A protein has these predicted regions:
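Short coil-to-beta-strand
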Residues: 1-2, 102
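Short, surface-exposed ligand-recognition loops at beta-strand->loop->(often short) alpha-helix junctions
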Residues: 11-18
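An amphipathic, aromatic/His-enriched active-site/gating alpha helix that lines ligand/cofactor pockets
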Residues: 25, 29-37, 51-58, 62-103, ...
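Active-site-flanking beta-strand signature of metal-NTP-handling nucleotidyl enzymes
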Residues: 2-9
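Short amphipathic alpha-helical segment that frequently serves as the phosphate-/nucleotide-binding helix
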Residues: 19-24
Length: 109
């Protein structure tokens, strides 16, 4: 398994539900193509005990892939920037503050 993690903020005026809909549509398409197994979208929940050097961003996503090879293939698919994925990706990305986005891939140790 490999997991892409993302941290970001929504642009002012963007409703959480609007982003969730766009993210779900994007991930459903990737699942239909055989790249993604599951995903999640969460909001940071500040906590006086758990918070040690927390991110400044409010939102988090994760996208799980069966393995590193499929994660790499998915990256190439998204980077190709072709329809129908282009519209789904741009619809989702237009809702986030680009300067706050951080994405990274993790694998089991």
């Amino acid at each position: 398994m490999a997991t892409m993690h993302g941290l970001f903020d929504l642009k002012p005026g963007i409703e959480v539900g609007a982003y969730r809909e766009a993210f779900e549509a994007f991930c459903r398409h990737l699942k239909e193509q055989g790249y993604v197994t599951r995903w999640s979208f969460m909001r940071r929940s500040p906590h006086p005990g758990y918070d040690r050097n927390p991110p400044e961003t409010a939102y988090y996503v994760s996208v799980d892939f069966p393995d590193r090879a499929i994660a790499e293939a998915c990256y190439r698919y998204v980077a190709a920037d072709e329809e129908p994925l282009r519209t789904l990706h741009r619809t989702m990305n237009r809702k986030v503050v680009p300067t706050t986005t951080r994405f990274f891939l993790f694998e089991p140790a």
